[in-house]
Amino acid sequence: MNRKNFIQQSSVAAAGMLWAPAFSFGKNDEVVLGHNNKRYRLDTKWGELDAAKYPVKDCHEMVQDSKGRILLLTNETKNNVIIYDKKGKLIDTWGTTYPGAHGLTLFNENGAEVLFICDNNRHQVIKTTIDGRELLVLDWPKETGMYTKPDEYIPTETAIASNGDIYVADGYGKDFIIQYNYKGEYIRHFGGRGDKDENLLNAHGVCIDYRHKKHPTLIITSRQQNCFKRYTMEGKYIETISLPGAWVCRPVIKGDYLYAAVLQSKNAEWKQSGFVTILDKNNKVISNLAGTAPVYSKGVPEEMYQTEKVFQYPHDVCIDDEENMYIAQWNSGHVYPYKLQPVS
């Protein structure tokens, strides 16, 4: 799905609305979400700031740096990057030139942390220092032979390999994954829109799975197909991880687990029907936050959907060094990120 159609289909339901969860959050209230050993206590106030001074539009993605700080990426050009401490206190902001800021990836490059920002509007991927100094800009991938103009390329996410190779997901364009070396030189492309196993449909996210240390692989979102797909690092298709009913965003791996925001439920499209899903090391769903309890039939999950009106359109999750989870939401009334703390 291209970015223009994606916005048009969803904006009717949510444009301009200020929204709050369908719960009371008084002093003594507590909302616990999830299943099995992945249950969390919800805090909707964690990231709130003075909207006049530090506004957000869409809260797209979040990462934690080595100092323990939480970085939020928004497409609000007054402050594209907002930096919090783990208690939700504002530390710093930067960025005024990323109107389509969408994907945020952190990478440790020879001891220095760098960021990769995907900008939908600029049709570029921008590499920066942790404080916003630009280091590299990747333009539209004409080297692939698959694109005739920048507008056809709408990157949504990156993943960076240990050798510095850059994988860019063109999730709102032609659904290719484009691989570059650390210098930004083109290596190959794969995926692309289609109905074969190796193809993708809304390749919204990508990450590198190091859970099998000797055999890292790529896990790539095929959101409109409600699944992740696994590929070799050279782009060869391996398998599909089916998640019926779940419009999953990027996969985020922490320890043995894979976490993902689910933008919306298939049975309630464009009705603020998102939730969060968690998979174990065998890529089996073990918990859905604000969603159905996971049930498997013949090795595949039964259709999953939102069961509690907590989130609107969750767009990303960030897991910190204490296993807390932070949720960024798209097109959700300019809400700031939520925090969820593990419940034992």
Task: Specify the residue positions occupied by each region the protein language model found.
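Blade-level signature of beta-propeller repeat domains, shared across WD40, Kelch, NHL, RCC1
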Residues: Y313-S344
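Loop/turn-rich, solvent-exposed surfaces of beta-rich toroidal or solenoidal domains
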Residues: A246-T292
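N-terminal export signals
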Residues: N5-F25
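Beta-rich, blade/repeat-based domains predominating
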Residues: K53-K67, Y98-G111, E143-D165, D195-T217, ...
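Blade/loop signatures of beta-propeller domains
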Residues: K27-T44
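Surface-exposed loop and turn segments in beta-propeller and other repeat-based domains
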Residues: T44-K53, L136-K149, I187-E198, I286-K309
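Blade-loop segments of beta-propeller domains
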Residues: N79-I82, K86-E109
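Conserved beta-propeller blade signature
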Residues: I70-L72, V114-F116, I166-Y167, T217-I219, ...
